Design a protein with these regions (language model features):
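Short, glycine-biased loop/turn motifs at secondary-structure junctions and
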Residues: 1-93
Length: 93
């Protein structure tokens, strides 16, 4: 399943450093507790990550792909044990 993930600057999420075009694995996936979270709809990610942080710096966003069967309890936020981080998305203007 393909989707989108938000990050703090530097592709950091919950103190974990991510990298483009890299696969990450965790031993367990449980919504809001364990695993790596993402949204299928890119606009849903904005419910969890603002475009601009309170300090004026932008958050980062990337395309992702779950390489296992993702879990969800609301069909909006998904959780995976094995997630491929694709390319970062940018806003050009």
């Amino acid at each position: 399943m393909k989707g989108y993930k938000g990050f703090n600057p530097g592709l950091i999420c919950k103190d974990k450093q991510y990298q483009e075009n890299t696969v990450f694995e965790e031993p367990e996936a449980k919504i809001c507790e364990k695993g790596m979270h993402f949204c299928e709809n890119p606009f849903d990610v904005l419910d969890y990550y603002d475009l601009i942080r309170s300090d004026g710096t932008p958050n980062e966003f990337a395309e992702v792909e779950a390489l296992d069967e993702p879990k969800t309890d609301d069909k909006k936020k998904f959780c995976s044990r094995k997630l491929k981080i694709g390319v970062k998305l940018g806003l050009s203007g």
